Amino acid sequence: MEKLQGHRELDRSWQHNFFYPLIFQEYIYVFAYDHALNKLILLENAIDKKYSLLIVKRLITRMYQQNHFILSVNDSNQNEIFGHKHKKNLYSQMITEGFAVIVEIPFSLLLISSLEGKEIVESQNLRSIHSIFPFLEDKFLHLNYVLDILIPYPAHLEILVQTLRYWLKDASSLHLLRYFLYEYRNWNSLIRPKESISPFSKRNRRFFLFLYNLLVYEYESIFVILRKQSSYLRSTSFGALLERIHFYGKIKYLVKVKVKVFGVILWLFKEPFLHYVRYQGKCLLASKGTSFLMYKWKYYFIAFWQCHFSVWSQPRRIYINQLSNYSLDFMGFISNVGLNSSVIRSQMLENSFLVDNIIKKFDTIVPIIPLVGSLAKAKFCNGLRHPISKSGWTDLSDADIIDRFGRICRNLSHYYSGSSRKKSLYRIKYILRLSCARTLSRKHKSTVRAFLKRLGSEFLEEFFTEEDKVLSLILPRDSSSSGFYRGRVWYLDIICIHNLANDE
């Protein structure tokens, strides 16, 4: 364990080192096991944690055996790996998962340090995805235009390997990665035929998501450096973007190239009201500038991706929208900047007059149609929004059934608690509440009315309104409302929203 701690306490300049030799060490499964334990802090129902210990340890055992890295040169049609054609996908999957565990170790160390309150050198604190919404409420009210950008992905796997060259000094690890990427391309086991890199297969999603996120990280690192060339800008608007230390030596060169090749003058980066938010495979770039400036940003991004990363992005993937006439559809919310009119009576001496004030307000609305579609797909209701029983859960105990329904309801309540209009959320809660009652009544071979009459209507009502009761105790209640607290409260401990279909 002392040797393990020694590896974890390595110098923080982890960009210049790699853990490739650990693949051939017996105790690499300890890293994988520790990684799975730390992941429990973030994801309550982490699915990937179940393979981290077992598969990586099996991988090491098989790599110690002989004649596994033997390719068949006599039979080109078989293209065997590890000596057995029917096992090649299994072994390759284990290696990619072990590779993903190892390369994620530096990021895990940064995340653990942030959770423990330790200072992270040369990086900003990691924040919840829900910190985006208070940020938008404060900043987007003063902006005019927004770029809705679909981040491009590389069409060739070699681009991913070239990206990793800036991170890894170990050539053998790059050769290993390149070897498996090209084998995967031949087997069509990682990427589906004739499809892009974004729809990853479920078995190898973790490995390719890491490579894709690393490429996006490269985009943003250079973008941050160019943006910091202007002393008028603040870095806090970029959220959780980690800085690349070894890029600082290339700042002057990059700026000169940008100006010379693209004809982009530096005042493009000196927009004092410029805010950037990334979510999933998209990003938003909002500015107080004119539409002409946003067009310059649009074609700058296209040239930037094409010339420096050999990634082609079509102009129709970047949309320019005016915030006053545009609704942002992202992260499960429909958000817009609306104009609210408020009339104030003012009196000066003996004269009184009315003042009509126009105030901008950032509204977040719960999308009822997609949520009902998710409930129908998960068999909680039919296409007509009528709640139905969850037949697959009737074999569970009553406590487990209530716990599953309650977990879904709490996740939705926490995630959409900051929305300005909660009427749609109450409809979703009603569907879940009645679906839970139908499931329990079906299990006990009774009707919903008889079941609720026997246990009391407060049986489910008290359970599903527990969060509202807690809020009503700690927060002031609206005097005009006799119900529970209905204000906007963002739960900033939210990391992700669970898919309803995964709760089965």
Curated annotation (Swiss-Prot):
It is found in: Plastid, Chloroplast. One of its GO terms (cellular component) is chloroplast. InterPro entries: Domain_X, Maturase_MatK, Maturase_MatK_N. It comes from the Eukaryota. One of its GO terms (molecular function) is RNA binding. Coiled coil: none annotated. Keywords: Chloroplast, mRNA processing, Plastid, RNA-binding, tRNA processing. Pfam families: Intron_maturas2, MatK_N. The keyword NAD does not apply. Belongs to the intron maturase 2 family. MatK subfamily. HAMAP family: MatK. Usually encoded in the trnK tRNA gene intron. Probably assists in splicing its own and other chloroplast group II introns. PANTHER family: MATURASE K. This is Maturase K. It comes from Amaranthus caudatus (Love-lies-bleeding). The lineage of its organism: Eukaryota, Viridiplantae, Streptophyta, Embryophyta, Tracheophyta.
